[in-house]
């Protein structure tokens, strides 16, 4: 087997050696920007370039790709594309694969040069065979991506909904209205408590926050982080519509520090995992997606499965990556380590699945 290796952030054991010869192909030297077409809004890159490196290069020229997943600090663009990575603004700008305009592939049967026009009606789109294939059918050697000018305005803000169901319904309404925020993330009560504890509120500010949320009947509620990017007047109009919807579902705006704290600390969680493991805790994640009508049942079923397998774990859940017909649910599980943590997690994952 030939296995492409980018930043090493995958969690699917793609480079584990099997009972046959396995060759890992690292892309550390294929990390260049090849071209930027400013009129078309398209950048051509090699697959080994990292997300931060590409973003810095584009920003210096007045552009942004804007794809920022949890693994942004270490993963490569080739990895994003090969796994159909979904970043924090996927609701507004699409997943990584939605921004791919051209691909060059080295495959066992032939080399492929895919994507020569903005759109085509000439049969199946062969790019879709390789996007999300995780290297199964060939190796991505070159990628062209749709980029956009740096936004005039960028806003990230926090809200508190009285319940997870209320927040979900508000997000669904924005999706149906076809004017969602570019970034939409809703945490359940368990995850919200952790996030708010890390938001920087303390002392008198924390006391005032607690009194305010109690008065507005959202104490212990569910934290939402929403964000918009673009021309200032467009952001203002979309934001006004969103808040009109949010108010219908009982949402209360939070201090600006909450949104700023999330933006500053959004990549901190994976680093806490090592400390928790050292302290004797298993920390793992699950992700799935479903239609709006099935999300509540999915949420309950996964929680029930995890509790049945692990006893009384801490399970924090957030809803993100909003689509017109549904959304993703992301579960973070923390529980004391068993003597055999691998078997412990396999049993929990099977129960949740």
Residue ranges and their predicted role:
Residues 1-29, 65:
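Glycine-rich N-terminal segment of FAD-binding domains in flavoprotein oxidoreductases
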Residues 5-9, 68-71, 75, 316-328:
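Core alpha/beta catalytic barrel or barrel-like domain that forms the active/cofactor pocket
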Residues 7-8, 28-30, 137, 259, ...:
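Short glycine-enriched loops at secondary-structure junctions
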Residues 11-13, 74-78, 191-193:
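Beta-rich nucleic-acid/ligand-interaction surfaces
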Residues 17-21, 80-83, 198-200:
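Short low-complexity, flexible loop/linker segments enriched in glycine and/or proline
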Residues 23-25, 101-105, 128-132, 138-147, ...:
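Short beta-strand elements
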Residues 31-185:
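FAD-binding subdomain of flavoenzyme oxidoreductases
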Residues 168-351:
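C-terminal substrate-recognition/cap domain of FAD-linked oxidoreductases
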């Amino acid at each position: 087997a030939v296995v492409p290796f980018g930043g090493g952030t995958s969690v699917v054991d793609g480079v584990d050696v099997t009972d046959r010869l396995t060759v890992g192909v690292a892309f550390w030297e294929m990390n260049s920007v090849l071209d930027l077409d400013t009129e078309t809004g398209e950048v051509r890159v090699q697959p080994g370039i990292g997300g931060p490196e590409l973003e810095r290069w584009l920003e210096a020229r007045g552009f942004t790709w804007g794809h920022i997943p949890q693994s942004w600090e270490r993963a490569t663009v080739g990895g994003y594309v090969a796994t159909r990575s979904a970043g924090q603004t996927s609701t507004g700008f699409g997943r990584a694969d939605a921004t791919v305009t051209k691909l060059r592939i080295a495959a066992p049967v032939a080399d492929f040069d895919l994507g020569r026009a903005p759109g085509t009606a000439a049969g199946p789109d062969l790019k879709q065979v390789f996007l999300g294939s995780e290297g199964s059918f060939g190796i991505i050697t070159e990628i062209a991506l749709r980029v956009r000018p740096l936004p005039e305005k960028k806003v990230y803000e926090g809200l508190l909904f009285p319940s997870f169901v209320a927040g979900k319904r508000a997000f669904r309404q924005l999706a149906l209205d076809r004017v969602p925020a570019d970034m939409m993330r809703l945490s359940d009560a368990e995850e919200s408590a952790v996030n708010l504890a890390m938001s920087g509120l303390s002392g008198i500010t924390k006391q005032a926050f607690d009194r305010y949320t109690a008065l507005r009947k959202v104490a212990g509620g569910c934290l939402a982080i929403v964000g918009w990017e673009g021309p200032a007047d467009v952001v203002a109009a979309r934001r006004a519509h969103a808040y009109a919807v949010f108010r219908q579902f009982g949402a209360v705006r939070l201090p600006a520090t909450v949104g700023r704290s999330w933006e500053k600390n959004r990549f901190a969680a994976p680093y806490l995992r090592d400390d928790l493991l050292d302290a004797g805790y298993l920390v793992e994640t699950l992700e799935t997606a479903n239609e709006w009508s099935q999300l509540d049942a999915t949420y309950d079923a996964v929680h029930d499965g995890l509790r049945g397998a692990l006893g009384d774990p801490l399970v924090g859940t957030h809803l993100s990556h909003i689509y017109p017909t549904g959304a993703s649910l992301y579960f973070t599980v923390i529980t004391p380590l068993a003597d055999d943590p691998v078997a412990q997690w396999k049993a929990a994952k099977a129960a949740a699945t």
